[in-house]
Amino acid sequence: VKQLRNAALIAGLCLLHSTLPVNAQTPPPPDPTEDRLMLSAGFLSAHPDLRFRLHGLEEFKAGRHEDAFKFFQRASFYADKPSQGMVAEMLWNGQGVAKDPALAYAWMDLAAERGYVGFLGLRERYWSALSEADRERAIREGEALYAKYGDAAAQPRLATVLRRERRKITGSRTGFAGNVQIYVPGPGGFEQIDGSKFFDERYWDPKQYQAWHDSIWTKPRIGRVSVGDVEQLPEAAPSSRIPVARPEVDAAEPQTPERDESGLGTQKDD
């Protein structure tokens, strides 16, 4: 069961626009993590949620679970719900970190904060397996997690980075101009990216960026394999069991090992 659930969640982490409904009224923007030129142009440095999630995936797939855990925590600092779900799974299974079911529940509760179905299912599975003592500790631990990693604290951090990095890339504080072109060094010289693609508002406007993620993760493909109770959600899943905590927007950012980022996100599985 552990292997199936991890495989499902890892697969979900690798999916972006492919999970969107085919009848969506507004077509999704191109997946930036599937475009080598966009990654080379510095897209990931401006999107730390995706950047550190990709690092976490690479470390996890390489079997370096301890470092993967650190990268998923850092992505979580920037409101990345899939990474919060991976932190929970690793705590639940004892991968790269000591097994801690109570803390795992708190992280999965956090991952389910926006009502994403896959994470809600895992959260309820965790809860049903906890002892009464672990349930009490999960709620206590969860308050501190929400203060640091909940949307009230993490989304303003991400919004600050998106706005700052967009100004840097365009070279102007007036915002994006439609005729901006981006040049990326390649094997045959410089290659050009159309600015209208790179600067799609859904990548840079904080509210639209969250809505883009919501459209991907609200009903993703995770939790749709045979992992028992994950598939059995009540019609109205309960809201968070953890009390509201005062957000700590200025909390210290988790630290991660240095890694070569030149090919980050460009290596595909065989």
Regions inferred by a protein language model and the residue ranges of each:
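Sec/Tat signal peptide C-region and signal peptidase I cleavage site
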Residues: 20-24
